[in-house]
From Swiss-Prot:
Residues 41-250 form the MARVEL domain. Residues 1-47, 142-151, 247-493 are cytoplasmic. Residues 352-361 have a biased composition (Basic residues). GO terms for cellular component: apical plasma membrane; bicellular tight junction; cytoplasmic vesicle. Disulfide bonds join 197-218. Keywords: Cell junction, Cell membrane, Coiled coil, Disulfide bond, Membrane, Phosphoprotein, Tight junction, Transmembrane, Transmembrane helix. It holds the Pfam family MARVEL. It is a multi-pass membrane protein. This is Occludin. Phosphorylated. The lineage of its organism: Eukaryota, Metazoa, Chordata, Craniata, Vertebrata. The chain crosses the membrane at residues 48-70, 117-141, 152-176, 225-246.
């Protein structure tokens, strides 16, 4: 049956509002730090895209330049070959061809695109893209003050948008220029161009001379198709650069420059080097620093201690008189003689502190109360840290380090699972149940009995051996993980 605790202090009245417990790993300061030196970060992706743009520009140069000899009369002579006796005239503006003269000439008029002009346009844009991509990459790698500012990424956005649009236009013009059938489609000269180029779209008879210049004019060669594809890929790369440049500016505004790391060597100047790197190798995400499990439930510490059968506050006798000296026997497994500590040396001159859990004194308290005499008994957690030294000694070789990493990964998974189960119990509003029981006017009502059942059931769970074992196991895993992490950190120094 429900019995209301005598020393009850509702958290809302004491603290001015409900205090909810934080779940495991509810806040990590490292998550607020943006690691912009990584290749997977927004600036890193911009660097990758700039490298790809430089490579694709070189590819466009090679592909387009390989077709230029067919558009240039280097020797000053005609580059045509006879295709038979007699002569033929296409009959459309600016185009003439003579078979009996062994000559060939082109003149473009109207709305037709000169292949030489289209190739010159795309070569010029490829040169601009090459320079811009190289400049962006160099500035991001050197990490100049300008390249770490919002103004730089604004310039990148504007320049990428302009150059990307021009490259898109140049690629379209080049596609039309190297494919005369496509640009003549729908015009009055489509029939004439098709009749001239149709001979190259069907199998050529043996022994028939082929005009190579006309062949390269009518047929889109493989290197020309590759240049077209590379042109569109450059446009896509500039679009990706614009997207991540906008994202970088937003992160700079959101987190501030003080929370952004542009160089890797600034991360662990005051800490352990390479610890975060090996933790990520054994877990999905970077393992945050392990912290003590928050033992208070949804309310004050008094609520939790009352629910576990521990007196919430010291009695009047304990307040008016010094706290009795406690002797904490240690386990024989550690091979140490039992020692004790005294918490009553200054009790007559100072207000008695709240009653602490046995076996877990703070070292700072010992230093203060004992006047620097710190040879008293160690806490249970300190003894537990010492016990891991024998099972996990300092690392001396790489193979041993890898074994420690694997052990860390398996134990970390179990620790998170147990922590999640404990957090589920912490979400149950114990203070609100107490308030409902205290405010209920009729103890025989159905609502009162329901709330009382919930309270008693929660109290039984928290006082059960299974719950205590989970808490003990969770704390043991935390100590073990901290020890393994420290050993690897010492080895990596």
């Amino acid at each position: 049956m429900y019995s209301r605790p005598s020393n009850y202090a509702p958290s809302k009245d004491v603290y001015g509002g409900e205090m909810r417990s934080q779940p495991a790993y509810s806040y990590y300061p490292e998550e607020e730090i943006q690691h912009f030196y990584r290749w997977s970060s927004p600036p890193g992706i911009i660097k990758i895209m700039s490298i790809l743009i430089v490579v694709m520009c070189v590819g466009i140069f090679a592909c387009v330049a390989s077709t230029l000899p067919w558009d240039l009369d280097i020797t000053g002579q005609s580059m045509g070959y006879g295709m038979g006796s007699g002569s033929y005239s296409g009959g459309y503006t600016g185009y003439g061809f003579g078979g009996s003269q062994m000559g060939l000439g082109f003149a473009y008029g109207g709305n037709y695109t000169d292949p030489r002009a289209a190739k010159g346009f795309i070569l010029a844009m490829a040169a601009f893209c090459f320079i811009i991509g190289l400049v962006i990459f160099v500035m991001l790698v050197t990490r100049t003050p300008l390249s770490t500012s919002r103004k730089f990424y604004l310039i990148v956005i504007i320049v990428s948008a302009i150059i990307g649009g021009l490259v898109f236009i140049a690629t379209i013009v080049y596609t039309v220029g190297v494919n005369p059938v496509a640009q003549a489609s729908g015009s009055a000269f489509y029939t004439q161009i098709v009749s001239i180029c149709n001979q190259f779209y069907s199998p050529v008879q043996t022994g028939v001379f082929v005009n190579q210049y006309l062949y390269h004019y009518c047929v889109v060669e493989p290197q020309e198709a590759i240049a077209i594809v590379l042109g569109f890929l450059i446009v896509v790369a500039f679009a990706i650069i614009i997207f991540f440049a906008v994202k970088t500016r937003k992160k700079i505004n959101q987190y501030g420059k003080t929370n952004i790391l542009w160089k890797k060597n600034h991360i662990y100047e005051d800490g352990d080097p390479q610890v975060e790197q090996w933790v990520k190798n054994v877990a999905e995400n970077s393992a945050p620093a392990l912290s003590d499990y928050n033992e208070k439930v949804d309310g004050s510490v008094a609520d939790y201690r009352s629910a576990n059968g521990v007196q919430a506050y010291p009695s009047q006798n304990n307040i008016s008189h010094p706290i009795a000296e406690e002797e904490l026997p240690l386990k024989e497994d550690y091979g140490m003689s039992p020692r004790h500590y005294s918490s009553s040396s200054d009790a007559t001159t100072k207000k008695a502190p709240p009653k602490k859990r046995p076996g877990k004194p703070r070292r700072s308290d010992l230093d203060t109360n004992e006047g620097g005499y710190n040879t008293g008994g160690e806490s249970a957690d300190e003894l537990e840290d010492d016990s891991w030294d024998s099972e996990y000694p300092p690392i001396t070789q790489t193979k041993q380090r890898q074994e420690y990493k694997q052990e860390f990964a398996s134990d970390l998974h179990e620790y998170k699972r147990l922590q999640a189960e404990l957090d589920e119990l912490s979400k149950i509003p114990v203070p609100s149940l107490n308030r409902e029981l205290g405010q209920s006017s009729r103890k025989d009502s159905e609502e009162y009995r329901t709330v009382a059942d919930k309270y008693n059931r929660l109290k039984e769970i928290k006082s059960s051996a299974d719950y205590r074992n989970k808490k003990k196991r969770c704390k043991g895993l935390k100590t073990k993980l901290n020890h393994i992490k420290q050993m690897v950190s010492n080895y990596d120094k």
